[in-house]
A protein has these predicted regions:
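Aromatic "clamp/platform" in nucleotide-sugar-dependent glycosyltransferases that forms part
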Residues: 293, 312
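A short, well-ordered alpha-helix in the C-terminal region of glycosyltransferases
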Residues: 255, 356, 370-385, 391-394
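Short acidic/histidine- and often glycine-rich active-site loop of Leloir-type glycosyltransferases
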Residues: 322, 335-344, 348-349
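N-terminal strand-loop element at the rim of the active site
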Residues: 13-16, 33-104, 201
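Short hydrophobic beta-strand element within catalytic cores of glycosyltransferases
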Residues: 329-332
Length: 405
């Protein structure tokens, strides 16, 4: 029997994002007869932490890395030398905040380059394959700190919308054996932005498991929709990317037009207080509910009339694929990659503003036959794609001499 290949996946945490969920799906489909799999998190936290398969070795976080990313230092300082990491973190984080015209992620790039890269020690294990399963800091850690025969980095979004500085990422992408993204549109954007690394770009879709999702959807929601209203569902991090500020403004317009609806938003994030204040300001407490993260959102998806995605940008949305598996019509804003996943047979694409979102929803409210037709079309297909696991093995077992088709 041939020796198992050693592979490590690196990601910040397992909070409820699309990249994190797709990693869990991938790990559940992995061939553990061929691979010995380690998982390294910068923070051992998140909604999906208890869904890591038992065959995966969830590593202890190296002490220096832990000090750079942990949320609290209570009980973490073991020795005087630890203070250098705490100082580096606070100095780096504080100084990059004053940089003009820099996004949060671009500031993290500078923080890694000027502060973290020199402070964090190399990882003490060696692998056949190392995978940075998210852009930005996991990528830099894998390429700077892990010894491996092959190194692959994932970009889970339309790169132009990430806020990252391409000049900083170029030398890293040159060092990587492959740069993997999740849709044709995202791949083309990477090739245009990084022509020097264009031959390294691979497109491999996220894994979505239809059987598992349908089984979970059979449960009942713990905070169910009311039956006397249109039922709208959105799922995503409460961040600027997901556009829930536009969603709440659209809800305000719909209420003014006299419609009765309940819009449940599943997710947590940095804009929770701001969005809650917005809901209160518009008097929408009876119409829009922020219910937090749910380890099983699929009963809500099964019970809704349609899924609403109000994003400003996406890579290839895991949530849209999951909605399609449950035969749920979709209303989505016209972000650059939306046509990779959606057409007018199964959903409605609207402009990226509150008025267009409200108008699209009003159309669905007034014409239930549209929703019925979309649902019938969705029911004719199986949108699961566990067979795509072969693309991952093709990458991991290839000589990475060029792009995949």
């Amino acid at each position: 029997m041939s020796q198992k290949r050693k592979i490590i996946f690196v990601i910040v945490s397992l909070y409820g994002g699309g990249a994190e969920k797709s990693l869990i799906n991938l790990l559940h489909e992995f061939d553990y007869e061929k691979y010995e799999v380690d998982l390294l998190l910068f923070k051992k936290e998140g909604l999906f932490l208890n869904q890591v398969p038992e065959q995966v070795n969830l590593l202890e976080i190296p002490h220096d890395l832990d000090l750079m990313y942990r949320n609290s230092y209570k009980g973490a300082i073991r020795r005087i030398s630890d203070l250098q990491y705490v100082l580096t973190r606070f100095l780096g984080t504080g100084l990059v905040k004053v940089l003009p015209h820099k996004s949060v992620r671009a500031r993290r790039q500078v923080r890694w380059k000027k502060f973290y890269r020199n402070a964090i020690r190399p990882f003490d294990r060696e692998y056949d394959i190392a995978v940075a399963y998210l852009e930005c800091e996991p990528t830099y850690y894998v390429l700077d700190k892990i010894r491996a025969g092959r190194k692959y980095v994932w970009v889970h979004n339309d790169y132009d919308s990430t806020g990252l500085d391409s000049k900083y990422d170029l030398p890293y992408f040159r060092k990587a054996d492959a740069v993997v993204t999740i849709s044709d549109k995202c791949a083309n954007i990477l090739r245009e932005r990084f022509p020097e690394a264009a031959e390294k770009v691979w497109c491999i879709p996220n894994i979505t498991t239809s059987k598992y999702i349908r089984e979970l959807a059979a449960d009942e929601p713990d905070e169910p929709f009311r039956e006397d209203r249109f039922k709208i569902l959105s799922i995503g991090r409460l961040s600027e990317q997901k556009g829930f500020d536009m969603a709440i403004k659209a809800a305000n317009l719909l209420k003014k037009r006299g419609y009765r609806f309940e819009w449940i938003i599943i997710g947590e994030g940095e804009l929770k207080n701001e969005l809650t204040e917005q809901i209160n300001r518009y008097g929408l407490n009876d119409d829009v509910r922020l219910v937090g993260q749910k380890s099983n959102p699929y009963p809500y998806m099964r019970c809704c009339d349609f899924l609403a995605q109000t994003s400003r940008y996406e890579g290839k949305s895991v949530v849209l694929d999951e909605a399609k598996i449950l035969s749920k019509p979709i209303l989505a804003t016209q972000y650059p990659t939306v046509h990779d996943q959606l057409d007018d047979k199964i959903g409605l694409i609207v402009g990226m503003n509150p008025e267009a979102i409200a108008d699209g929803m009003e159309r669905l409210f007034l014409h239930p036959e549209l929703l019925e037709g979309m649902q019938r079309e969705l029911e004719q297909h199986d949108f699961g794609n566990t067979h795509e696991i072969s693309c991952y093995y093709e990458l991991f077992e290839s000589d990475v001499s060029g792009e995949n088709e």
